[in-house]
From Swiss-Prot:
Subunit (UniProt): Component of the small ribosomal subunit. Part of the small subunit (SSU) processome, composed of more than 70 proteins and the RNA chaperone small nucleolar RNA (snoRNA) U3. Interacts with RPS19BP1; the interaction is direct and mediates the integration of RPS19 in state post-A1. Interacts with RPS19BP1.
Lineage: Eukaryota, Metazoa, Chordata, Craniata, Vertebrata
Superkingdom of the organism of origin: Eukaryota
SMART domains in the record: Ribosomal_S19e
N6-acetyllysine found at: K23, K111, K115
Annotated positions of the N6-succinyllysine modification: K143
Biological role: Component of the small ribosomal subunit. The ribosome is a large ribonucleoprotein complex responsible for the synthesis of proteins in the cell. Required for pre-rRNA processing and maturation of 40S ribosomal subunits. Part of the small subunit (SSU) processome, first precursor of the small eukaryotic ribosomal subunit.
GO biological process, one term: translation
Protein name: Small ribosomal subunit protein eS19
Positions carrying Omega-N-methylarginine: R67
Record-stated family: Belongs to the eukaryotic ribosomal protein eS19 family.
Encoding gene, per UniProt annotation: RPS19
Naturally occurring in which organism (per UniProt): Oryctolagus cuniculus
Cellular localization per UniProt: Cytoplasm; Nucleus, Nucleolus
Gene3D superfamilies for the chain: Winged helix-like DNA-binding domain superfamily/Winged helix DNA-binding domain
């Protein structure tokens, strides 16, 4: 659909569609440790979904589309959460830096993301085009139903 951007579609449907696209393309470099890692220190278990790396990459690409100029540190803030400390009060805890770094490096390998000259990383024009194309497909599928 012409004129449809990432902002115009449901974020959950878009992230699922982009994750499926990344998995189907087979070009995203997935580390071998993805089945044994926790995503943050406040998490108790590893993710149940075996395709979580594709979902995280899709979510990160969407975040860079909307805001841009985000680095590893800001990604750890986004994917952080509440650390439960037993009888002591809960506090905010950041997400894994290694996971955030590897996701951004994998997206750089696809030429969807590049390092910004100021700080962090930003979406390339090719990456923005891919995300808009997938958003158009999601909107067309939604309109069909």
């Amino acid at each position: 659909m012409p004129g449809v951007t990432v902002k115009d579609v449901n974020q959950q449907e878009f992230v699922r569609a982009l994750a499926a696209f990344l998995k189907k393309s087979g070009k995203l470099k997935v580390p071998e440790w993805v089945d044994t890692v926790k995503l943050a220190k406040h998490k108790e278990l590893a993710p149940y979904d075996e395709n979580w790396f594709y979902t995280r990459a899709a979510s990160t690409a969407r975040h860079l589309y909307l805001r841009g100029g985000a680095g590893v540190g800001s990604m750890t803030k986004i994917y952080g959460g509440r650390q439960r400390n037993g009888v002591m009060p809960s506090h905010f805890s950041r997400g894994s830096k290694s996971v955030a770094r590897r996701v951004l490096q994998a997206l750089e390998g696809l030429k969807m993301v590049e390092k910004d000259q100021d700080w962090g990383r930003k979406l390339t024009p090719q990456g923005q085009r891919d995300l808009d194309r997938i958003a158009g497909q999601v909107a067309a599928a939604k309109k069909k139903h």
